């Protein structure tokens, strides 16, 4: 009698599956909260809230690249069966210093930065913009620093823990928003920011504090700090340039679009972001797997995994776009009933193209980062940022939301779309 064999599911797929659930919860929270926040704040104040939440991505670099540097060291040391406690301890010291320096700097700069960023609103909102900007910045700095927890857990192939913490923090934030909607329906932008994002900032900090106690006895020397920082600088530069590329649309929106168009664009991007979050969850889980396969020189297996993920990602984006377009009236009515979401089919086609390009580009960017090969990114991403900024500014002036998407697609197509895969193949052949 033939024995039945249980199919062994790869660990990165188990982690990716938990990431999908986590990302769905997070994206769902962000979408559902739109309805409550619009009722609490009103259209113009919610547009300000939306632009402020765009700072979350900017302050993701509050970890100054230490998270990615630490993740790669953990993956490499795990492959060689060596301890990495000293690296975690050193990383916490560096991150604490980063938190203090950035928070102090923003205390003095918030008024000036907010006056440049939040220019298209009423005098009442602009008069309070400095405090809104500072509160948002502090919350997002804590979130950026705390994100190192997720890097550690993914490197240890315990990504499911990271996903639970992340999803739980956003669920708690959503419950806070619902509470102020019913208990304090006329709350300010500050209350809304703290309600939604304070749990997201606090939970990872609590976890990393306990983790620090666990590695407290590890011996750290100057070389440990030096090694972490030498790699982190590359990740910091790349992350900063990537953020400029991906967040230029928020800067352009703040200057070129009306409050109504800002809401249309950001809500639509949140809906599509739900799909893309699912793919980025796969990439996040694959990063340590790719790093270990590279150390073990298993290039054929690595290439096969990447090829299948790109094909699956593009197919998923296409299918998801069709689903959203068919049900768009129903979806938008649930998210924010009463807001005019008259969006042309061209926007949906452009979004499908844009996110398919992102699947391709982000996959190769992840591969190069897992190999610590960042020089090409330093060279090519500034060109992308320049092209993206100029084209989005110009096209948004003439075509509004469609113009921003034209600029995004052009910036990727003319630079990283071809540059990253060419460089990856060149480097992988040399290392093989």
Swiss-Prot record:
<feature type="transmembrane region" description="Helical">
    <location>
        <begin position="305"/>
        <end position="325"/>
    </location>
</feature>
<protein>
    <recommendedName>
        <fullName>Putative O-antigen transporter</fullName>
    </recommendedName>
</protein>
<keyword id="KW-0448">Lipopolysaccharide biosynthesis</keyword>
<feature type="transmembrane region" description="Helical">
    <location>
        <begin position="334"/>
        <end position="354"/>
    </location>
</feature>
<feature type="transmembrane region" description="Helical">
    <location>
        <begin position="376"/>
        <end position="396"/>
    </location>
</feature>
<feature type="transmembrane region" description="Helical">
    <location>
        <begin position="47"/>
        <end position="67"/>
    </location>
</feature>
<feature type="transmembrane region" description="Helical">
    <location>
        <begin position="134"/>
        <end position="154"/>
    </location>
</feature>
<comment type="pathway">
    <text>Bacterial outer membrane biogenesis; LPS O-antigen biosynthesis.</text>
</comment>
<dbReference type="InterPro" id="IPR050833">
    <property type="entry name" value="Poly_Biosynth_Transport"/>
</dbReference>
<keyword id="KW-0472">Membrane</keyword>
<feature type="transmembrane region" description="Helical">
    <location>
        <begin position="271"/>
        <end position="291"/>
    </location>
</feature>
<feature type="transmembrane region" description="Helical">
    <location>
        <begin position="400"/>
        <end position="420"/>
    </location>
</feature>
<keyword id="KW-0813">Transport</keyword>
<keyword id="KW-1133">Transmembrane helix</keyword>
<keyword id="KW-1003">Cell membrane</keyword>
<dbReference type="GO" id="GO:0009243">
    <property type="term" value="P:O antigen biosynthetic process"/>
</dbReference>
<feature type="transmembrane region" description="Helical">
    <location>
        <begin position="234"/>
        <end position="254"/>
    </location>
</feature>
<feature type="transmembrane region" description="Helical">
    <location>
        <begin position="90"/>
        <end position="110"/>
    </location>
</feature>
<keyword id="KW-0812">Transmembrane</keyword>
<feature type="transmembrane region" description="Helical">
    <location>
        <begin position="164"/>
        <end position="184"/>
    </location>
</feature>
<feature type="transmembrane region" description="Helical">
    <location>
        <begin position="14"/>
        <end position="34"/>
    </location>
</feature>
<keyword id="KW-0997">Cell inner membrane</keyword>
<feature type="transmembrane region" description="Helical">
    <location>
        <begin position="189"/>
        <end position="209"/>
    </location>
</feature>
<comment type="function">
    <text>May be involved in the translocation process of the nascent O-polysaccharide molecules and/or its ligation to lipid A core units.</text>
</comment>
<dbReference type="GO" id="GO:0005886">
    <property type="term" value="C:plasma membrane"/>
</dbReference>
